C-alpha cells in the first residue's frame, strides 16, 4: 500500500513550512510564505512511531477574489486533500481567528475527510491551551496547540496524526483495475498509442500541440486483467503554458502520475530525450510509480542492426532517474510491439506490489556488508547497519535500522540500494529506503521479539 499522506493547509504566514520542517526533521521547505510564492504541492518524508508517511505542503491558501493565482491555489489544495489521509489546518495562536481562517474552515467543512486544527506559535505550554480554545469556533474539532519553531506539542500532534492512519497491511492490494497512465510531452503519440492499444479511436489524434487538454480514462480487459488507461495532456515547461484549461489539464496529468499503478513514459524516437522528458522521468521517480519507457514512432527511424542498442544506451544515460525501468520500441501507427506493453506493465505492477520477508531482506544485507563495510569517519566512528524490514509496497519500501543515519553517505546508500535490487529483483519499480537511527539495546529487543514470534 502507498504511504499515507498528511496535507498541510493554511493561510500565509502561519508557519506551515516551519511545521513541515519540524515534522520531517529537515530544512527542505522554504520558510517564506508570501502569498503566491508556493503554488505547487511539495512532498517530504516523515516518520513517527514506526510509521512512514508523506507530508504535502500546498503553500499559502488565500480566498482573495483579486488574487491572480486563486484558481490555481484552490486546485492544488483540492488535489492535496483528495489524496490525504488527514489534513492539518494551521492557524496562528498569537494573531487569533481571522477572516481567512474562517474562509478556509468553511472550505474544509464542505468536504469529507479527517481534519485537525493546529494552533501554531504557542510557545508556552501553559498559555497554549488558552490561546487554542478560541479556535473551537471554526467547527473543525479540537485545536492542538504547538510551537513549530521550538517543537512544543508536536509529539502529541504526531501521535494523533498516526492514530488516524489506516492499519499497515502489506497484503492490501485493491481489486480495482490496474491504472496505467500514458505520460509524455505534447505530440509524442500518446493518443495514437492509446488508440492502438484499445483498437479504436478513443482520443483525439492531431499534430497540434495540446489537443488533449484533459485526462481521458478508458477501461479495457486484457487476458483476464482489468486495466484503466489514462491518456494525459502533454506536459511541458510551466512557463510555456498559458493560464487556463491547459494549465488545469497539466495539473491533472501530474495527478494521474500520483494515482497510477504504472506509468508509460512515451519518448519520440525522432526527437530523442529532451529536458522535459528528463523532468517527467524525475517526477515519476519522485512519486514512486512503477514505469516502463516506450520509444514511439520507431517506424519513422532510419535504422540498421545497431540502431536500437545505440539509442537505448543513449536514452538510459539521459533518463538515469529511471535506470530500473524496462524499455520497449513501438509504433502506434503500425502497431509494432504495442502488445508487449501489457506484459512489461504487468511485470512492473506485480513487482511494485511484491513483499519480501524480513529474514530474506537481512540475508541480502548481510551479504552486502561482507563485500563492503559501512564507512568510518575521521574520528574513527563507523556506521553500523543492524537490520532491515519491508514496511510498504507500491513502491516497495524498506526501513533500515542503523546506529546513526548521518554516518551513511549517499555513495554507500546507493550501494545498499543496488544490492537490495540485485538480490531481490524489483524490475520496473523504484524502491525506497528509510534510514532510521536506533540504539543497540532496542535492536536486540526487536530481534528477540521477532524470533519469539517465529517460534510461536
From Swiss-Prot:
Which top-rank group of organisms is this from? Answer: Bacteria
Which PROSITE patterns does the entry link to?
G_ENGA
Query: Which keywords has UniProt assigned to this entry?
Result: GTP-binding, Nucleotide-binding, Repeat, Ribosome biogenesis
* Every EngA-type G domain range: 4-169, 178-353
At which positions is GTP 2 bound? 184-191, 231-235, 296-299
Concerning SMART domains, the annotation shows: AAA (SM00382)
Task: Outline the extent of the KH-like domain.
Answer: 354-439
Among InterPro entries, the record links this protein to: AAA+_ATPase, G_ENGA, GTP-bd, GTPase_Der, KH_dom-like, KH_dom-like_a/b, P-loop_NTPase, Small_GTP-bd
Q: Which GO terms describe its biological process?
A: ribosome biogenesis
Indicate which residues the UniProt annotation says bind GTP 1. 10-17, 57-61, 120-123
Give a GO molecular function annotation for the protein. GTP binding
The free-text function statement in the UniProt record for this protein reads: GTPase that plays an essential role in the late steps of ribosome biogenesis.
What family does the database annotate? Belongs to the TRAFAC class TrmE-Era-EngA-EngB-Septin-like GTPase superfamily. EngA (Der) GTPase family.
Q: How does it assemble?
A: Associates with the 50S ribosomal subunit.
Q: What is this protein called?
A: GTPase Der
